[in-house]
């Protein structure tokens, strides 16, 4: 023991005199130890440190790559006389897997039995609690101040250890799992994860000691798989971060992470004991093996121990459980394959693994097997062989499950798969069980055949997923479908099913393309009666259809609800490449040297069943692409629409006409033909997550091509525009997507999720409020006041869901508003801020000047001015308010030459004068004519007086009784103008006779009057 004031290490004070340069950190440690001894020198005497009271550590590496090994006490101040520092191994030194670095002699030694090591790495595979060094943090996203009082706290939203793995949060909070590690050399981090739900954002990234993130190539997790990321030398902080945003009632499924392994730590000073349920029988083991079923092990075991006869255990168990008595929930029934006599046997089997005891009190016995029944017929398209097996009919023939029959002339087989008899599992189907505890496949049978249906078998636990998969290599759609770029339907799958459940069971239907991860399409919860479901395949690729049934989501083992089952009665897939046929359909005939053969009709042509010839569909009709037989296959288009070039769809060419008794209103919506977007009002979840619905619309034109695109970028926020990648993209006339703003998530781009098609087919365009069952309530929007009725576009979606059994519908109401320049303004119903009041029927109001009718001559006034200085102007002005757009232009002002009032007055006087002269001339003319008649009459009177003379008979007219005798004598002698006027003014005598002087003709006798 050193005396007070004496320093046993003078070199600590005079380090500059030594010839060997000792690292500064080493001198600091030595000086601290000496000072510590001097300070306590007056206290009780300390004993020399034993090997169990200290451990060795390396100092930090210097610039030359060197380090020192120093002894560090477990509890400072309890002992003294620690070993002197010695030069350590190189900083890059490491041991192999299965070895550890013995710090006492600084050499690698193999791990003992029951232990393992990764050499230069560490592994985390036990998650009963959060391992040392890990941290789980949670945080709210952007929370609106107005709802802060009702916002739930996020402090409990963290990653939760669950034994074999750690699970993420499932709410709208952000949960982060962190681990910091210092690497002596470049290494990797490797982990397995289960990422089943796209409504969760899952990202993994690494930051260095300057808090700078590494390249984000692997930041966004795409699918369930094993992942690894390279790590740089130095400090690395690993982040696993999740954020759920299921804005609907659906509860997201958590992300699961397990088996995290990190390499590059340079050395491991000890081996890790095998966790319970595993063992390592040999020295130098890099990993521990799982105990088989009905065996168990404790921590650090070299072998597994068998369970007692009355106990059992699952694979990798640390304890054995008491076997319960067998019940009817522990066995299931199935059917054997048909024998040579065409019979099948009903067989009862214990569920695997068998955990119950038959000999226990109250245990049930396995029912007797072997009851024979007649085999059901083969599935359509198959025939029964001599040994009672079913084989597919060759191409060109069909069957209903019995014998194969060649298709008649003029027909071709309708290939597909139709399964409705379940005596054996079809060759293109397989079944398995996925553990609901550790999410590993167990290699068990998940579905069993039962004659007229297939049902879920008994699993190892009620939360296991009973999986059934059907793989289709590809499709062979009709040529008319291939030519139609807008009709994406290449095939359909229809299945009939039911579920019988006593708790919260779930049946999932999933679809995977080209071996990619299955995407959930539809989910049914609880008991569902026997019903049919149809899904449309829109991509010609290798497709896998998966049905997964889970009896309960509770995280516990046991069989309590084995009577909860899912049954599938039939599965029908159309247009399958290499499929079989249950019937033959008519085809178009093509003449050849070998006779007639089937061929495809051109797009838009239907097949005449009798002649096998192709005929073009009439105008304004479309062809049923998958049933092009007969004239009835041509379906009329709705009002206001027309067919495209190949008669595959009805569309509106951005024009519309409306007839009224007074005029015809024409419309042109070309200014509205592009895509437009509309965001709904912001909403908030219970955790305060801000989101809104975003709509994209394409109204008309483009030959009916769907222009609105909505994308799900949750699984990969880095995909370029136009590339599908792992994202789900929806193309329609109207689509909807849920958007979380970029300022909320902290990403460069906003997060879009759950794209939905709202309009796949244009039903018609009309001013009516109802069309083919689709209603556009006028009361949803403020009433129009212009007097011009709204034009309504009626759309329908092909998506059929449980809540929307008839599919979704969309109405877009176009309203004339001269104050809204094109393209105008889109509005949502005020009482339904998300565009729908029931989740199935969506409504939009589009106000624009482009929605007004085209201008015509009826839309302007004509004003004619007075004649000023010989000029008259004609002016045209629009009627107010102007409720038209486009069409004819307002005519320019017209200027014409005109005559003043003075001119017309002169014309009138001249015309009057001429008229007076004309009347005078006419008067004279008729007067003269009258004088001639007067003369003739006078002559007749003179002849009448010669009664008794021998004169010739008078040439006169008879005088009727009561008539006056008036004789006018016409004098042959000419008179002057004055004499004519005087004669004209003479008057008759009072007795009614005129005094006429008579002149006797020459040579005649004198007569007395």
UniProtKB/Swiss-Prot annotation:
Swiss-Prot/TrEMBL GO biological process terms: autophagy
Region annotated Disordered, chain positions: 988-1009
Membrane-crossing residue ranges in chain numbering: 907-927
One Pfam family per UniProt: MRH_ELAPOR1_9th
Cysteine pairs bridged by disulfides in the record: 274-291, 304-326, 307-338, 654-700, 710-735, 804-840, 816-852
PROSITE patterns named among the record's database cross-references: MRH (PS51914)
Glycosylation: residue positions: 153, 387, 400
Signal peptide residue numbers: 1-35
InterPro entries: Elapor1-like_3rd, Elapor1/2, Elapor1/2_C, Elapor1/2_GBD, Elapor1/2_MRH, Elapor1/2_TNFR-like, Growth_fac_rcpt_cys_sf, Man6P_isomerase_rcpt-bd_dom_sf
Domain annotation MRH: ranges: 652-854
Residues exposed to the Cytoplasmic side: 928-1009
Membrane topology summary: Single-pass type I membrane protein; Single-pass membrane protein
Main location: membrane
Extracellular side: 36-906
GO cellular component: endoplasmic reticulum membrane; Golgi apparatus; late endosome membrane; lysosomal membrane; plasma membrane
Alphabetical keyword list: Autophagy, Cell membrane, Disulfide bond, Endoplasmic reticulum, Endosome, Glycoprotein, Golgi apparatus, Lysosome, Membrane, Signal, Transmembrane, Transmembrane helix
UniProt subcellular location: Cell membrane; Late endosome membrane; Golgi apparatus, trans-Golgi network membrane; Lysosome membrane
Function noted in UniProt: May protect cells from cell death by inducing cytosolic vacuolization and up-regulating the autophagy pathway. May play a role in apoptosis and cell proliferation through its interaction with HSPA5.
Record text on subunit structure and interactions: Interacts with HSPA5; may regulate the function of HSPA5 in apoptosis and cell proliferation.
Family indicated by similarity: Belongs to the ELAPOR family.
Name by which UniProt lists this protein: Endosome/lysosome-associated apoptosis and autophagy regulator 1
Organism of derivation: Mus musculus (Mouse)
Gene name linked to the record: Elapor1
């Amino acid at each position: 023991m050193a005396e007070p004031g004496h320093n046993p290490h003078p070199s600590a004070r005079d380090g500059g005199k030594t010839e060997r340069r000792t690292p500064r950190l080493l001198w600091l440690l030595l000086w601290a130890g000496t000072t510590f001894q001097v300070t306590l020198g007056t206290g009780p005497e300390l004993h020399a440190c034993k090997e169990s009271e200290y451990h060795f550590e390396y100092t930090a590496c210097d610039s030359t790559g060197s380090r020192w090994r120093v002894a560090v006490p477990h509890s400072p101040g309890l002992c003294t006389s620690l070993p002197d520092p010695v030069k350590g191994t190189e900083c890059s030194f490491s041991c192999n897997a299965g070895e550890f670095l013995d710090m006492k002699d600084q050499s690698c030694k193999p791990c003992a039995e029951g232990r393992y090591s990764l050499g230069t790495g560490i592994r985390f595979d036990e998650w009963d609690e959060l391992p040392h060094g890990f941290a789980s943090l949670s945080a709210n996203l952007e929370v609106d101040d107005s709802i802060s009082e009702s916002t739930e706290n996020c402090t409990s939203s963290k990653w939760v250890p669950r034994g074999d793995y750690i699970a993420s949060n499932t709410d709208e909070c952000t949960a982060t799992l962190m681990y910091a590690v210092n690497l002596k050399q470049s290494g990797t981090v490797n982990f397995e994860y289960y990422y089943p739900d796209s409504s969760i954002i899952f990202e993994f990234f690494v930051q260095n000691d300057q808090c700078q993130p590494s390249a984000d190539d692997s930041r966004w997790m795409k699918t369930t798989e094993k992942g690894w990321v390279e790590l740089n030398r130095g400090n690395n902080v690993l982040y696993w971060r999740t954020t759920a945003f299921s804005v609907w009632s659906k509860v997201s499924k958590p992300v699961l992470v397990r088996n995290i392994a990190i390499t590059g730590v340079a050395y491991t000073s000890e081996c890790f004991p095998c966790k319970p349920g595993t063992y390592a029988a040999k020295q130098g083991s890099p990993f521990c093996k799982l105990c088989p079923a009905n065996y168990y092990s404790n921590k650090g075991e070299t072998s597994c121990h068998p369970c007692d006869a009355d106990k059992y255990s699952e694979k990798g168990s640390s304890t054995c459980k008491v076997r319960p008595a067998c019940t009817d929930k522990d066995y299931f029934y199935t059917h054997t394959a048909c024998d040579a006599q065409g019979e099948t046997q009903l067989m009862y089997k214990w569920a695997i693994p068998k955990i119950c005891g038959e000999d226990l009190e109250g245990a049930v016995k396995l029912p007797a097997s072997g009851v024979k029944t007649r085999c059901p017929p083969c599935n359509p398209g198959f025939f029964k062989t001599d040994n009672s097996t079913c084989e597919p009919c060759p191409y060109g023939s069909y069957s209903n499950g019995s014998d194969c029959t060649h298709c008649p002339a003029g027909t071709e087989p309708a290939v597909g798969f139709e399964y409705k008899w379940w005596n054996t599992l079809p060759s293109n189907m397989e079944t398995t069980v996925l553990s609901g505890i550790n999410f590993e496949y167990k290699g068990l049978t998940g579905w069993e055949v039962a004659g007229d249906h297939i049902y879920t078998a008994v699993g190892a636990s009620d939360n296991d997923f009973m999986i059934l998969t059907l793989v289709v290599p590809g499709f062979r759609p009709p040529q008319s479908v291939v030519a139609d770029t807008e009709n994406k339907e290449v095939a359909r799958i229809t299945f009939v099913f039911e579920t019988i459940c006593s708790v919260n069971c779930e049946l999932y239907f999933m679809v995977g393309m080209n071996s990619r991860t299955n995407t959930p399409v539809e989910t049914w919860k609880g008991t569902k009666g026997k019903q049919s479901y149809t899904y449309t395949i829109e991509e010609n690729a290798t497709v896998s259809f998966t049905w997964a049934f889970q009896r309960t989501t509770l995280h516990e083992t046991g069989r309590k609800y084995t009577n909860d089952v899912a049954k599938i009665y039939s599965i029908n897939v159309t247009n399958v490449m290499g499929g079989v046929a249950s019937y033959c359909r008519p085809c178009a005939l093509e003449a050849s040297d070998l006779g007639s053969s089937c061929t495809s009709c051109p797009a838009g042509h239907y097949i005449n069943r009798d002649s096998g010839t192709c005929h073009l569909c009439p105008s304004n009709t479309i062809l049923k692409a998958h049933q092009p037989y007969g004239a009835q296959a041509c379906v009329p288009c709705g009002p206001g629409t027309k067919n495209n070039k190949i008669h595959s769809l009805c569309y509106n060419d951005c024009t519309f006409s409306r007839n009224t008794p007074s005029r015809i209103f024409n419309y042109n919506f070309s200014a509205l033909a592009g895509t437009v977007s509309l965001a709904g009002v912001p909403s908030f979840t219970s955790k305060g997550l801000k989101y809104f619905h975003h709509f994209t619309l394409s109204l008309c034109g483009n030959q009916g091509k769907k222009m609105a695109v909505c994308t799900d970028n949750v699984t990969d926020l880095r995909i370029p525009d136009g590339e599908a990648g792992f994202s789900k993209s929806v193309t329609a006339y109207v689509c909807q997507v849920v958007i979380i703003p970029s300022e909320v998530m902290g990403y460069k781009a906003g997060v879009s999720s759950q794209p939905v098609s709202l309009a796949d087919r244009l039903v018609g365009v009309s001013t009516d409020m109802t069309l083919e069952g689709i209603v556009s309530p006028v009361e949803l929007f403020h009433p129009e006041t212009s007097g011009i009725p709204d034009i309504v576009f009626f759309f329908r979606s092909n998506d059929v869901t449980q809540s929307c059994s008839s599919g979704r519908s969309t109405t877009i109401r176009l309203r004339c508003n001269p104050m809204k320049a094109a393209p105008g303004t889109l509005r949502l119903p005020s009482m339904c801020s998300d565009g729908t009041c029931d989740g199935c029927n969506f409504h939009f109001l589009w106000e624009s000047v482009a929605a007004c009718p085209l201008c015509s001559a009826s839309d302007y006034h004509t004003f004619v001015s007075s004649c000023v200085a010989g000029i008259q102007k004609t002016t045209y002005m629009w009627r107010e308010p102007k409720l038209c757009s486009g069409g004819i232009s307002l005519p320019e002002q017209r200027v014409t030459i005109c005559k003043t009032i003075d001119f017309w007055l002169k014309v009138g006087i001249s015309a009057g004068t001429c008229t007076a002269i004309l009347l005078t001339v006419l008067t004279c003319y008729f007067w003269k004519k009258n004088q001639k008649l007067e003369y003739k009459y006078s002559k007749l009177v003179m002849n009448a007086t010669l009664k008794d003379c021998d004169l010739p008979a008078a040439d006169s007219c008879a005088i009727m009784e009561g008539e006056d005798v008036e004789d006018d004598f016409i004098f042959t002698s000419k008179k002057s103008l004055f004499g004519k006027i005087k004669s004209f003014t003479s008057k008759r005598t009072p007795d009614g006779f005129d005094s006429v002087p008579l002149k006797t003709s020459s040579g005649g006798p004198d007569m007395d009057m």
